[in-house]
């Protein structure tokens, strides 16, 4: 025994052998899942195996909001700017989320660009081989098309490059905490000072 921990006393009574959890089905379950993935890939051909295209979103809360991840679906505004009708989007492998709202121009533009890149690479098979409609791909593109396995257009988190500066005498003399306190005080008294200045100006005019 080490450290100030509780001395373990195993409470093995009440026919504990009957309550032992076993995992003997794990290898077979792994095989079943693999076979199911292969069957699904054949069934949804020529669509990508990893499902529809998802937008790039920031995680919620202070802990995760600096990280980007895949969201549920593109907003109606993003689809509108990209020039894709909202009824057409789910039929060509683009997920739509009518609840999500765009709260920044940067996020909107990045997802619109993502949609445009996807649309440029997209190969659309006709519903019926003999009836080719507007928007369907050419026979040459259809002949060369392959099913995308795994993730496509992966979301990569880009880290901002830090710029190193030389430490000068001014930087060494700068008191960061004092500066923060001063600015906080100025912000707190800003309203009262502005009011006092306005009253003084009014007195001068008299």
UniProtKB/Swiss-Prot annotation:
GO terms for biological process: translation. GO terms for cellular component: cytosolic large ribosomal subunit; cytosolic ribosome; plastid. InterPro entries: Ribosomal_eL13, Ribosomal_eL13_CS. Keywords: Ribonucleoprotein, Ribosomal protein. This is Large ribosomal subunit protein eL13x. GO terms for molecular function: structural constituent of ribosome. PROSITE patterns: RIBOSOMAL_L13E (PS01104). It comes from the Eukaryota. Residues 186-206 are annotated as: Disordered. Residues 196-206 have a biased composition (Basic and acidic residues). Belongs to the eukaryotic ribosomal protein eL13 family.
């Amino acid at each position: 025994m080490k450290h100030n921990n509780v001395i373990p006393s195993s409470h093995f009574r009440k026919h504990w052998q009957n309550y032992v959890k076993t995992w003997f089905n794990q290898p077979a379950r792994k095989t079943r899942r693999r076979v199911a993935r292969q069957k699904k890939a054949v069934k949804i051909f020529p669509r990508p195996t990893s499902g529809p295209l998802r937008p790039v979103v920031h995680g919620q809360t202070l802990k995760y909001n600096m990280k980007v991840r895949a969201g549920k679906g593109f907003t109606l505004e993003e689809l509108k700017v990209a020039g894709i009708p909202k009824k057409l989007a789910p039929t060509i492998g683009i997920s739509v989320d009518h609840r999500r709202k765009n709260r920044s121009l940067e996020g909107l533009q990045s997802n619109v660009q993502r949609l445009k890149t996807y649309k440029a690479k997209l190969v659309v098979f006709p519903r019926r081989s003999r009836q080719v409609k507007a928007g369907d791909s050419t026979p040459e593109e259809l002949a060369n098309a392959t099913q995308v396995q795994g993730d496509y257009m992966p979301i990569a988190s880009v880290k901002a490059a830090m710029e190193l500066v030389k430490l000068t005498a001014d930087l060494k003399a700068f008191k960061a905490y004092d500066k923060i306190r001063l600015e906080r005080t100025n912000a707190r008294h800003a309203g009262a000072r502005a009011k006092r200045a306005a009253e003084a100006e009014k007195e001068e005019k008299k």
